[in-house]
Amino acid sequence: MTLFESIVLGVVQGLTEFLPVSSTAHLRIIPALAGWEDPGAAFTAVVQLGTLAAVLIYFYKDIYAILAAVIQGIMKGRPFDTHEAAMGWMIAVGTLPIVICGLLFKTEIETSLRSLYWVSGALIGFALLLLVAEWSVKKRLKQNMSMTSMDTIGWKEAIFTGFAQCLALIPGASRSGVTITGGLFLNMSRESAARFSFLLSLPSVFAAALFELYHTWDIIASSAGSIAAITAATITAGITGYLSIAFLISYLKKHTTSIFIIYRIILGAGILSLIAAGRLQP
């Protein structure tokens, strides 16, 4: 992988990691269209350290408040004393499903599930599921039902969203896409669903990145070019990832996810068309 390719893929990773359009799908598609080598699931996981940094920087106040509350709660012997403390434990419990599924299906995730048929199917299928979630939100708003905010998220929302996050292991599904969808089904506001989605992603993204870095370090370290490429991709992913978070949080305050639903369906259909025309190899 050249330095130029790594920077391009880093930008793509950062821009698409937090939008509900699937960064994995784009990292699978763009190299195929450009005639580049598939960077692989390990590259994606390691570069996510950049987007992880973006979340840490953007939500540093929330993260500090949660960690401080968890520590104080443990020291006082009342681990769920405040909502911030409970939020920390909810994020921890909500992370367990994807960790277990990720380890159980690691081989499939890195091989057969990276087929463009799976990617396009996930793009379209989960777009339709997000559409149904938006319909449910619209129906509840017509009934003047109050929406769940970050201050009122409970164990039900955390556990359900945690299981929904497992679907993000399917390339094309989108981590933010499936967790925001889960949040909308549970009556969370779009902004709150996105915020909780990003906070919930922290432990699993960090663990996955370290896991892949540990298992691929010998290959990476054997080439100065590999280290430079991954470093460049990680830095660009972090910068563009921060901008992507800021955009999505602001956008969802006033808009639905319709634009992302339409984009996913068009992209998924486009991939299938290119495969049928022989322009892409599945």
UniProtKB/Swiss-Prot annotation:
GO molecular function, one term: undecaprenyl-diphosphatase activity
Disulfide bonds: none
Domain of life: Bacteria
Keywords annotated in UniProt: Antibiotic resistance, Cell inner membrane, Cell membrane, Cell shape, Cell wall biogenesis/degradation, Hydrolase, Membrane, Peptidoglycan synthesis, Transmembrane, Transmembrane helix
One GO BP: regulation of cell shape
Reactions performed catalytically: di-trans,octa-cis-undecaprenyl diphosphate + H2O = di-trans,octa-cis-undecaprenyl phosphate + phosphate + H(+)
EC number assigned by the record: 3.6.1.27
Main location per the UniProt record: membrane
Residues that span the membrane, as ranges: 1-21, 40-60, 85-105, 117-137, 196-216, 229-249, 258-278
Bilayer topology annotation: Multi-pass membrane protein
Localisation per UniProt entry: Cell inner membrane
GO annotations of cellular component type: plasma membrane
Function noted in UniProt: Catalyzes the dephosphorylation of undecaprenyl diphosphate (UPP). Confers resistance to bacitracin.
Family, similarity comment: Belongs to the UppP family.
Additional facts recorded: Bacitracin is thought to be involved in the inhibition of peptidoglycan synthesis by sequestering undecaprenyl diphosphate, thereby reducing the pool of lipid carrier available.
Name of this protein: Undecaprenyl-diphosphatase
UniProt lineage: Bacteria, Pseudomonadati, Chlorobiota, Chlorobiia, Chlorobiales
